């Protein structure tokens, strides 16, 4: 890994942008379905819209990370914000076809933001403050991102009661537009440009060939690193498992709530989950300063996954509302620990010129696991209930995480012998 050039850290500049983006996202995600239905979409068209968004993200996830490594992460991230602005405009003023176009643009914005500014932030933090400080970098990133999303969701719920220009939910959308534009301008002026790998290597090959070559090199580098392979395999397992929690906790809560006000519980638990992720990130960041060996961090990573699986099993078997609320919060607390340690392991083992590419590959693996899980979960739920599904997913999580641990021990042993 070579020294980053021309790159002062300025963490507050990055974190302020992450905060604005997270707040903007929270303003709309809390009423996402309602926005689409108010624009004339039926429930079937809403499903199509979500599908278009998901397919776009999947298709562009890896190319966007490669593009950031080759042609500049700041540049590609700014393109992602322009796409997000266009999608918000489509949602605010469009009819059904324009809203569907907005879903495609939103998916492109999500994909192009992955492995770009976040990769640049982690890289510059590592070079200015050392590899052992990566846990703190991820802690701050998660804390700002999730807390701003949580606050944005609360504010979004309040704004949703007001219409702008007689159009429902435009207060949320216009506020999100202003914050996204502010983040774009903020980063444009305050974060230094990064030197693209294409300029460092003076590669004159056609862009598509450069992207294919970059992807091949990143995958080859991952195959040589036991830690990177654990991160990528673990991402597939994580996506497969967590999608079952994220998609089905709300209907499960509804069955347990009985006479409780479900809207209040949904809002309270959503906020509690985000707060728990922040707290888990803080705990993991502190642990990373105490445990400085790769093997020790792998153990924490695997222990957090074991704890997540045990919480899932308990939540599936203990069918009481107070217990579920506690276990749901605990699940996200441990997930925050896992996410921070996972990010630290990947960042400390990724080459600079492939950092964004590997982050996008990991994100793609996470989404791929989630897609497969959604297809299989639908079949399981046709015959069995949500608790049984969670037990099956927990079993897969335990097996997959155990495989990651065995794989690391065998590969790391071979590497050390060489």
Protein language model features and the residues they cover:
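Juxtamembrane intracellular "pre-TM" segments in multi-pass secondary transporters
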Residues: 1-9, 192-231
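Helix-loop junctions at membrane interfaces in 12-TM secondary transporters
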Residues: 9-11, 92-103, 314-328
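Substrate-agnostic recognition of the 12-TM MFS/MFS-like secondary transporter fold
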Residues: 13-31, 49-66, 72, 80-81, ...
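Short amphipathic helix-loop junctions that connect adjacent transmembrane helices
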Residues: 30-45, 247-264
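Structural signature of the two symmetry-related core transmembrane helices
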Residues: 75-90, 177, 297-313, 394
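A membrane-interface helix-boundary motif in multi-pass transporters
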Residues: 161-178, 260-267, 296, 379-397
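Helix-loop junctions on the cytosolic side of multi-pass membrane transporters
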Residues: 169, 176, 181-204, 406-417
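C-terminal transmembrane helical hairpin of 12-TM major facilitator-type secondary transporters
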Residues: 295-338
